[in-house]
Amino acid sequence: MTDPTSIKHQTTLTSGTSADFTQASEPFALFAEWFSEANKSELNDPNAMALATVDDSGLPDVRMVLMKGYDEDGFVFYSHKASQKGQELAGNPKAALLFHWKSLRRQVRIRGLVTPVTDEEADAYFATRPKQAQLGAWASKQSQPLESRFAFEQAIAKVAAQYIIGEVPRPPGWSGWRITPVRMEFWHDRPFRLHDRIEFRRDAAGQPWTKVRMYP
């Protein structure tokens, strides 16, 4: 185990704007503000988020995915429906997200209910992906054992030969999900671990939010 005395205690920080975010009255405008700042300060993938799900035994899984859209209906990402995450969401359509923007010393935690996006939404997003990524979606049997990298590249080449000309359609097993929040927590690092933390809560989508300030 790491020697605790070797870990430096934080006494200073750099952060985003100095506005008091704890005065925000609803979460989506605050998220938009923070996400806009993260787009300017993060070295890569400010839309990266940890996605937590549970399997049918209650054992949790977590992995990084990329948010591909958000509005007041929720946060959207895409993947294979047969993947581990897809199967777990089919069995238990609830999930948690975490955005961590280290450059701003901020994080946003989200908990909510999950619904599939429409075929029209999935088609529209898939059409924006680079062709090589589209081919990879056809070739990948996500979350299944893979013999070798070469075998994967062969599978991609086989699919590419079928779509030399024209558009690549969306695979039927590839789609997206929308997480509609019932909890959104905003956390901002402060010196000496005296952080600022607020949570917005509601019982269901469409209902008004209640804001609670939390001990750090």
Swiss-Prot record:
InterPro entries, A to Z: Pyridox_Oxase (IPR000659), Pyridox_Oxase_CS (IPR019740), Pyridox_Oxase_N (IPR011576), Pyridoxamine_oxidase_dimer_C (IPR019576), Split_barrel_FMN-bd (IPR012349)
Swiss-Prot/TrEMBL catalytic activity: pyridoxamine 5'-phosphate + O2 + H2O = pyridoxal 5'-phosphate + H2O2 + NH4(+); pyridoxine 5'-phosphate + O2 = pyridoxal 5'-phosphate + H2O2
Note accompanying the cofactor annotation: Binds 1 FMN per subunit.
Cofactor(s) listed: FMN
Binding site for substrate: 68, 125, 129, 193-195
The keyword Iron-sulfur belongs to this UniProt entry's keyword annotation: no
UniProt-listed Enzyme Commission number(s): 1.4.3.5
Positions of FMN binding: 63-68, 78-79, 85, 107, 142-143, 187, 197
Leader peptide range in chain numbering: none
Functional pathway: Cofactor metabolism; pyridoxal 5'-phosphate salvage; pyridoxal 5'-phosphate from pyridoxamine 5'-phosphate: step 1/1; Cofactor metabolism; pyridoxal 5'-phosphate salvage; pyridoxal 5'-phosphate from pyridoxine 5'-phosphate: step 1/1
Keywords of this entry: Flavoprotein, FMN, Oxidoreductase, Pyridoxine biosynthesis
Enzyme class: oxidoreductase
PANTHER family: PYRIDOXINE-5'-PHOSPHATE OXIDASE, PYRIDOXINE-5-PHOSPHATE OXIDASE
Similarity comment text for this entry: Belongs to the pyridoxamine 5'-phosphate oxidase family.
Summary of the function given for this chain in its UniProt record: Catalyzes the oxidation of either pyridoxine 5'-phosphate (PNP) or pyridoxamine 5'-phosphate (PMP) into pyridoxal 5'-phosphate (PLP).
Name under which the protein is recorded: Pyridoxine/pyridoxamine 5'-phosphate oxidase
Organism lineage string: Bacteria, Pseudomonadati, Pseudomonadota, Alphaproteobacteria, Hyphomicrobiales
